[in-house]
């Protein structure tokens, strides 16, 4: 390959501000500015073969009919979170793989799997070989709870648990012990709801999905009958969407187990809520009203609000999780900006498993690429990677 002086680009900003489709113009402008002084066709390297990487490749290929795109991926197979992060009972979300496959089969796009950039090849070497390097390698690390006991057996990150039932190679030996009645999930986003749904779904439903065989066997033997989804703020700040909440409500042989006191005074705020938030809140309030006192179903799930983890409590053997201690919070402010403030009161919940779904973070990929450890991001200006002095580093971009 001819050596061409290149750079790194940060497309994360472009995707966040413009959206997947709106990024087309920004990418087109970027490609037009590629240095062509060598007289060769522009060559772009994309590090990371997940959704952000393939959307970037797709738009680059549309922007110019002479650009060549190489996609490097640490795993042997492409598509990242679409393949290993989407719930197995949501096949419609995975349909985008068909589009990504067409992109991967494009005559000017080349996929290179099982290549660990930063180890097998450095970013500096890539910058010498390409006009531009796009960093879209995702967030592969878990955010820690930072509480005593989180290293006990029976405590998992949602990322690892999802990877386990979806067949992510690094999680296939996770082997969670489902020989307990209650599971506590920390976090109230869609990933938390996905995990809760998989734990409580009837086996006949799961057998129709592409869930891994080892996960299906473990869930067949599972004794889990109750899942509590805990959040540090209130019902008006749930991060999950109405579709996922409705799926939980409609799950066969399962009933909602909510605390009516959590919704006190909420009805007075409905008229001022944005429509999506209003619909979700009305659905929750209706569920609380309809299911009050109804615990006849075999399995139960519910939200617990205004609670933050303080400590994972060990069980009788001192080695496994046996419960979790939660700080009781109150809200200061209102709406999306409301902050959870501890009241000083504590509450213990008995459980045999704790799953943390409080988000992921990126890791540094290469010593030559600047990285802000506090925010776990690559510093960038409108997608262009910045050095430690805040100056642009050539044509390096971030995405995803």
Could you say what each language-model-derived stretch is?
Residues 142-221, 375-386:
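Glycine-rich dinucleotide-binding loop and its adjacent helix/turn
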Residues 76-132, 277-298, 302:
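N-terminal Rossmann-like dinucleotide/flavin-binding domain of flavoprotein oxidoreductases
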Residues 45, 99-155, 302, 310-325:
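Feature captures the FAD/FMN-dependent oxidoreductase FAD-binding
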Residues 64-71, 93, 193-347, 366, ...:
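Dinucleotide-binding/catalytic capping subdomain of oxidoreductase cores
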Residues 1-41:
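N-terminal mitochondrial targeting presequence
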Residues 38-50, 178-189:
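Beta1/beta-strand and adjacent pyrophosphate-binding region of the FAD-binding site
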Residues 42-66, 192-200:
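N-terminal Rossmann-like FAD-binding beta1-loop-alpha1 element of flavoenzymes
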Residues 154-174, 312-316, 320, 332-400:
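FAD-site-proximal beta/loop scaffold in flavoenzymes
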């Amino acid at each position: 390959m001819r050596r061409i002086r290149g750079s790194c680009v940060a497309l994360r900003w472009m995707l966040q501000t413009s959206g997947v489709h709106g990024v087309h113009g920004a990418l087109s402008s970027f490609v037009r500015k590629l240095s062509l002084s060598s007289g060769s066709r522009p060559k772009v390297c994309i590090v990371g073969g997940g959704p952000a990487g393939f959307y970037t490749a797709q738009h680059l290929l549309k922007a110019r009919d002479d650009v060549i795109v190489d996609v490097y991926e640490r795993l042997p197979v492409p598509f990242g979170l679409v393949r290993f992060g989407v719930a197995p009972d949501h096949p419609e979300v995975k349909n985008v793989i068909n589009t990504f496959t067409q992109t991967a089969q494009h005559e000017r796009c080349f996929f290179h799997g099982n290549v660990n950039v930063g180890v097998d090849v450095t970013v500096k070497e890539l910058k010498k070989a390409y006009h531009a390097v796009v960093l879209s390698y995702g967030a592969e690390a878990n955010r820690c709870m930072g509480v005593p006991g989180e290293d006990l057996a029976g405590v998992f990150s949602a990322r690892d648990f999802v990877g386990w039932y979806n067949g992510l190679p690094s999680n296939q030996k996770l082997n969670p012990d489902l020989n307990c009645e209650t599971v506590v999930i920390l976090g109230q986003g869609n990933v938390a709801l996905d995990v809760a749904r998989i734990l409580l779904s009837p086996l006949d439903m799961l057998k129709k999905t592409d869930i891994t065989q080892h996960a299906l066997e473990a869930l067949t033997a599972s004794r889990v009958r109750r899942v509590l989804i805990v959040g540090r703020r209130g019902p008006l700040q749930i991060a999950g969407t109405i579709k996922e909440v409705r799926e939980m409500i409609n799950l066969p042989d399962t009933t909602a187990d909510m605390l009516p006191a959590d919704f006190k005074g909420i009805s007075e705020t409905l008229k001022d809520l944005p429509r999506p938030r209003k619909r979700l809140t009305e659905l929750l309030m209706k569920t609380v009203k309809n299911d009050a006192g109804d615990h006849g179903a075999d399995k139960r799930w519910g939200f617990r609000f205004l609670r933050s983890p303080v400590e994972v409590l060990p069980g009788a053997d001192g080695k496994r999780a046996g419960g979790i201690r939660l700080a009781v919070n109150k809200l200061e402010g209102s709406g999306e900006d409301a902050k959870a403030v501890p009241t000083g009161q504590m509450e213990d919940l008995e459980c045999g498993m704790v799953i943390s779904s409080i988000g992921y973070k990126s890791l540094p990929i290469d010593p030559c690429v600047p990285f802000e450890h506090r925010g776990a991001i690559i510093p960038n200006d409108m997608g262009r990677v910045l050095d430690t002095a805040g100056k642009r580093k050539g044509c390096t971009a971030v995405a995803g």
